[in-house]
UniProtKB/Swiss-Prot annotation:
This is ATP synthase subunit delta. It is found in: Cell inner membrane. Belongs to the ATPase delta chain family. Keywords: ATP synthesis, Cell inner membrane, Cell membrane, CF(1), Hydrogen ion transport, Ion transport, Membrane, Transport. SUPFAM superfamilies: N-terminal domain of the delta subunit of the F1F0-ATP synthase (SSF47928). It is a peripheral membrane protein. GO terms for molecular function: proton-transporting ATP synthase activity, rotational mechanism. HAMAP family: ATP_synth_delta_bact.
Length: 177
């Protein structure tokens, strides 16, 4: 959701900056991952949305559920709870993860395929994409049957659409203009 991304960005950047200062980038990534997963669970999501539960109770429950030990991460959860922003934790995690990859000179890539890919195919694609984008890529694969065939690759804001659906859309656009 674009709105969540906009709201989460300053929180992710601030937390990442603090993590750099404290030399805790990787360890906080793990804590954020757990927090993001917990707030998406049904009962916890309902609790977060309940106006009757005050912010400090929500923060304490999350901190206990995840088992956070780090003082700064606990304070971060308390700040988010006070601002009624706990629901953006998954987006904060995603952006923090992107900042971590960027810091380590790695880009995130998603390969969308109409059909499951073998490990060999993913490996070959990874080699080609690493060369094309002149960067080390962390690749994930998602199945999207609506592509009909072929693949679509997203690296940051760049999209390489080699799918049948993409070609049909381009053909349709050409024919209707």
């Amino acid at each position: 959701m674009a709105e969540f991304a906009t709201i989460a960005r300053p929180y992710a950047k601030a937390l990442f900056g603090l993590a750099q200062e404290k030399n805790q980038i990787e360890s906080w990534l793990g804590g954020l991952e757990k927090l993001a997963a917990v707030v998406q669970e049904g009962k916890v999501a309902l609790l977060i949305d309940r106006p009757e539960t005050n912010a400090s109770e929500k923060a304490d429950i999350l901190i206990d559920l995840v088992g956070l030990k780090d003082k700064e991460l606990k304070n971060f959860v308390i700040v988010l709870a006070g601002q009624k922003r706990l629901s953006i934790l998954p987006e904060v995690y995603a952006q923090y993860q992107d900042l971590t990859l960027s810091f380590n000179h790695i880009k995130s890539a998603v390969i969308y395929s109409a059909y499951p890919l073998t490990d060999k195919q993913v490996g070959e694609l990874a080699q080609m994409l690493n060369k094309r984008f002149d960067s080390e890529l962390k690749i994930s694969v998602e199945i999207e049957p609506e592509l009909i065939g072929g693949i679509k690759v997203e690296v940051g804001d760049q999209v390489l659409d080699l799918s049948v659906q993409g070609k049909l859309s381009a053909l349709y656009t050409t024919m209707t203009n």
